[in-house]
Amino acid sequence: TYTLFWKLQIIRGAILMKKELSPPFKITNDILNLVYEIGELVGKISAEKEFEKNLTLRKENRIKIIYSSLAIEQNTLTLEQVTDVINGKRVLAPLKDIKEVQNAYEIYERLEELNENSIEDLLLAHKIMTSELIKESGRFRSKNAGVYQGEKLIHMGTLPEYIPELINNLFLWLKNSKEHPLIKAAVFHYEFEFIHPFQDGNGRIGRLWHSLILSKWKKFFAWLPIESLVQKYQKEYYIAINNSNKDGES
């Protein structure tokens, strides 16, 4: 199984190296209906402008975003502890978990400054997110990496030599695509996780970039806790990713 994963990665990586190749995906009627329904809800939220007026609500939601995104990655801090860390209070917890919160808060606070089409900004975001936590902070991994469930390999990341070109192609597609932002964000999220470009922090950065793409469409997405939904439906989230892996489509 391990060898088969690598063979499939080599084949798919070679295919995606072609210039201007779009990620493989189909837009079904169900997807179009969901885009329409979400668009209707987004319009109502935008009209209220609640996030722009209520700074307390924005901060509370940002804390929920950080708590959920890190909890998905097995960070042990509670929502209350995350709040205390962000507010500069002393928390008795593993230093690694505290540092993850501090790093995540720093980059989410700079979300509006990031260019969603910039690989340089992607690397900067990763550098901040993983500062003092991993050796290859702020750069693409140089070694093979996979995602494991216990001892079971559930996803093998793209071979390191393919990563720069694949990420470049993905960002070119993101910049030039005329698809709806909801579709672009979802496709990017999956393709990014499939490539698995970093030693660690791929999930956190993937969710960050998903929010970034949507925030360039509607500003309030910068404070909307999408990560909390991912945490709540984590099982379904991974099932969807695995189904895309099997189908070979975003």
Mark where each language-model region is.
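FIC/Doc superfamily catalytic core
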Residues: 1-250
